[in-house]
Amino acid sequence: MAYTTFSQTKNDQLKEPMFFGQPVNVARYDQQKYDIFEKLIEKQLSFFWRPEEVDVSRDRIDYQALPEHEKHIFISNLKYQTLLDSIQGRSPNVALLPLISIPELETWVETWAFSETIHSRSYTHIIRNIVNDPAVVFDDIVTNEQIQKRAEGISAYYDELIEMTSYWHLLGEGTHTVNGKTVVVNLRELKKKLYLCLMSVNALEAIRFYVSFACSFAFAERELMEGNAKIIRLIARDEALHLTGTQHMLNLLRSGVDDPEMAEIAEECKQECYDLFVQAAQQEKEWADYLFRDGSMIGLNKDILCQYVEYITNIRMQAVGLDLPFQTRSNPIPWINTWLVSDNVQVAPQEVEVSSYLVGQIDSEVDTDDLSNFQL
C-alpha cells in the first residue's frame, strides 16, 4: 500500500482504525474517534516551557563542590537521558506517522515528539552550564558501553518497524527480493511489530527515566543542583503524559475495540511483552549499579533504587494488562512523589520558577445556561 501525504479519497475518519487504515488527509479536530488524544494534545500544549526559563547558574557552584562519585552519578544520568530523548525526539514521528489513520492520534504523536526535543535541549542547557567543554560529555554518549547496552534494546523495535513499513509501502504484501535478501511482507506481522514497538516505547516512558529522576530529586532534597531538579520535574511531568498516551494506544489495541485482529496479536505477544518489560527493569537495575559503583549518596543507594524500579515496573505492567514480575508492593522512596506530582508543592511565584503554571487553559466555550443565574 503506497503512502501518500494527502489522500484525495474521501473517507469517514471516525470509521478508520488508529493504524493501517487510509492515511490521514484533512487534519480536522471538530470530531474525534478517541478524544483522549485531543485531551493529551491540549494538556501538553498547556505545559509548554523552555529550559532557558529556569536559572541553573547556582548549579555550577554546587557541581564543582560535589565529590567525584556524585559527579559521576549526576553527569552519567544526563548522558543517559540525552540518549533516551534523542531517540524519542525523532522515532515516534518516523515510525508511527506513516501508519496512523486518524488526525487526533497523528497530531498527538507530533506534539509528543516535539516536547521530547525540548527535553534534549534542556540537557544541553544544563551541561553547558556546569562543564567548560560540553563536547566531552556528548561525545562519550555514543562510546559509553553502559549507555550503548540500553540503546540497543530501545532502538531495535523502532528500527524493525520502520524497515518493514518501508517495504510494505513500497512493495506491498508478498515475498520480495531486496538487495539479494528475501523479504516477506505480511500485514499481520507488521501489526505485531507495531504492537511490540509501542510496548517497548511504553517501557521506556514507564521505567527507563526514573532512576535518573530519583537521583536528580535526591540532590535537590539536599538543596543541591536545584536548577537541574526543576527542569527534570518539568520533564517528568511531560513524560507522565507520554506514558498515558502509549498506555491508551496499547489498551485500545489489545481490547479489540479499534482492530479485532490486534486483540489476537496482543495475546500472542503477551510473553514477549512481559520479557521486554522485565529486561528493561533489569537494565535499569544494572544502571543503578553502574551509578553507585564508587559510592552512594545521602538518601539514595543501589538497593533502594532497585526496589523502586521493581515497584514502578509492577504498576506500569499492570496498566497494560501484563502479569506482575516482582514482589515489591510499596514505594521505598515516597518522597519522590512530591516531585513527580506537580500539584504537591506550593511556592511563592516571586521566589522561584513555578513549574506548575499552565498556559492556554481557559475554557472559551460559553453557553447561555451559564448565565441563567445572573440578574441585572
Curated annotation (Swiss-Prot):
Q: Name one GO biological process term.
A: deoxyribonucleotide biosynthetic process
Catalytic reactions of this protein: a 2'-deoxyribonucleoside 5'-diphosphate + [thioredoxin]-disulfide + H2O = a ribonucleoside 5'-diphosphate + [thioredoxin]-dithiol
Q: Which GO molecular function, any one, fits this protein according to its record?
A: metal ion binding
Under PROSITE patterns, the record lists: RIBORED_SMALL
Q: Name the cofactor(s) required for activity, per the record.
A: Fe cation
Active-site residues, as the UniProt record annotates them: 123
Entry keyword set:
Deoxyribonucleotide synthesis, Iron, Metal-binding, Oxidoreductase
Give the binding site residues for Fe cation 1: 85, 116, 119
Q: Which InterPro entries match?
A: Ferritin-like_SF (IPR009078), RNR-like (IPR012348), RNR_small (IPR033909), RNR_small_AS (IPR030475), RNR_small_fam (IPR000358)
What is the E.C. number? 1.17.4.1
One family name in Pfam for this protein: Ribonuc_red_sm
Cofactor binding description? Binds 2 iron ions per subunit.
Q: Does the keyword Zinc apply?
A: no
Q: What SUPFAM superfamilies has UniProt attached to this entry?
A: Ferritin-like
Binding residue positions for Fe cation 2: 116, 205, 239, 242
> What Gene3D superfamilies does the entry give?
Ribonucleotide Reductase, subunit A
UniProt miscellaneous comment: A substrate-binding catalytic site, located on R1, is formed only in the presence of the second subunit R2.
**What is this protein's function?**
Provides the precursors necessary for DNA synthesis. Catalyzes the biosynthesis of deoxyribonucleotides from the corresponding ribonucleotides. R2 contains the tyrosyl radical required for catalysis.
Question: Quaternary structure per UniProt?
Answer: Tetramer of two alpha (R1) and two beta (R2) subunits. The B1 protein is a dimer of alpha subunits. A radical transfer pathway occurs between Tyr-123 of R2 and R1.
**Which family does the record claim for this protein?**
Belongs to the ribonucleoside diphosphate reductase small chain family.
Q: What is this protein called?
A: Ribonucleoside-diphosphate reductase 1 subunit beta
Originating organism: Salmonella typhimurium (strain LT2 / SGSC1412 / ATCC 700720)
Q: What is the lineage of its organism?
A: Bacteria, Pseudomonadati, Pseudomonadota, Gammaproteobacteria, Enterobacterales
Q: Which gene encodes it?
A: nrdB
